Amino acid sequence: MKRATTFLSLLALSAGLLAQSSVKTERQYLSGRGCDDMVQWDFMCTGGNNSGKWAKIGVPSCWELQGFGTYQYGMKFYGKAFPEGVADEQGLYKYEFELPAEWNGKQIELVFEGSMTDTQVKINGRKAGSMHQGAFYRFIYNVSDRVFFGSKKKECS
């Protein structure tokens, strides 16, 4: 009896694994995968160099290295709450994209591999979820109810 129970348990587990393997994940990158293949997004920095106007910026990147904001590397501000001279600008990003029509009715997720500090994401003008607070680690938003098929414009900001 014990062997039969073990066999049936293994059989059920195997069937579950086979069923899971039939699910196909499709990807559409909205950014590049590194400095060799950046994708141009609309960008505005709220302070520092080249601020207050929309421009193009490669994503992924560091905006200071592309001439925006306040370059502040090497400043001695550790251990202070908010010392004088530390930049407090924000970067605003926008990107329009289309999704394949065959994705309609499927789960759509925006996956971020990393973002420095606080990140609020909107898709077509609606918040994708709660604000990401942290550093360079992966976070994901399910935006299935925020994308509209049949229109060409999808905006992530």
Roles of regions detected by a PLM:
Residues 6-7, 28-31, 142:
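General helical structural elements
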Residues 1-25:
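Bacterial Sec-dependent N-terminal signal peptides
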Residues 15-16, 37, 151:
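Generic detector of short, well-ordered, non-transmembrane alpha-helical segments enriched
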Residues 1, 52-55, 75, 123, ...:
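Generic cytosolic/nucleocytoplasmic N-terminal low-complexity/intrinsically disordered segments
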Residues 44-48, 88-157:
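Accessory beta-strand-rich segments of carbohydrate-active enzymes
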Residues 21-111:
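Extended carbohydrate-recognition surfaces in non-catalytic/accessory domains of CAZymes
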